């Protein structure tokens, strides 16, 4: 009997020992499994945090550049400012804020610039501002822009004083301009955001695009880069204007064309940045003289040839315009409207007789 009790006790002890070992193994195994699970979860969290957050883009699209801007700014009419471009008038002020710049010859083979602005709100100095030539009015009308100038040729005065174009000039809003003492007249006339806006308010011009106005250009979509099918490389573009002798140089890193004139970089003195653009359009036009024998006029209706330059390449294009107050369309060799890369554009009017002076090279 005593012997049986010992056997039973031994068996019970063995069972208890086995149970304890089993519990330890289970506990140890569970702990190990838990650590693996935690490691997996930790790794997942680390991978998630490395994904960059996306910033919501403004909902508006610029009519001038195709880029995202605020909806309020996107529906606002641009202003077009006439820039003096002789050597006594540089450096320019505020022009780096422009989305579109037109360059065209005037008397004496010099050029003037017309800069189209959407956002000029912070600019205290814009210019120097110079006088109007009639064909610049038609450039401004293509963009439904309010045209700012100081003075005008006698051939433009009647048009400016009619209701054909909303304009801010010396004859109707002289208080919107001011003169500086660092240059001699007439190269020292400037305006500002405050001067422009107060003049527009005084003259009662509407501030939003007219109903039904559509974007002048078609632009590449976000994250899209237009690469022309042409094999013609365009790393340097000389425009052929004889006085300021401007040219652009392509920077492959940022896809921009940087501008030079008068033998040096073309700088905006308000931010000390060199002017640059994503697109260049060269439009060959016929030009004649008015009866005074010196004032230039341009034929902007009909059709003609030109160049479209972007992303390091150039292709031949044709341009068409049915009526003076209409829109100029630029067509590729297949007859389709060109698509521009997002960003600034420089549009250059070159007289047909000087077309061979335009040089596009590697």
Where are these regions (language model features)?
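N-terminal Sec-pathway targeting helices
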Residues: 2-16
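A surface/extracellular/periplasmic glyco- and lipid-processing/surface-interacting theme
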Residues: 2-4, 38-41, 46-102, 107-362
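Compositionally biased non-globular segments, especially hydrophobic aliphatic-rich helices
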Residues: 12-15, 30, 45-52
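ASCE RecA-like P-loop NTPase motor cores
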Residues: 19-21
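Hydrophobic single-pass membrane-insertion segments
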Residues: 23-36
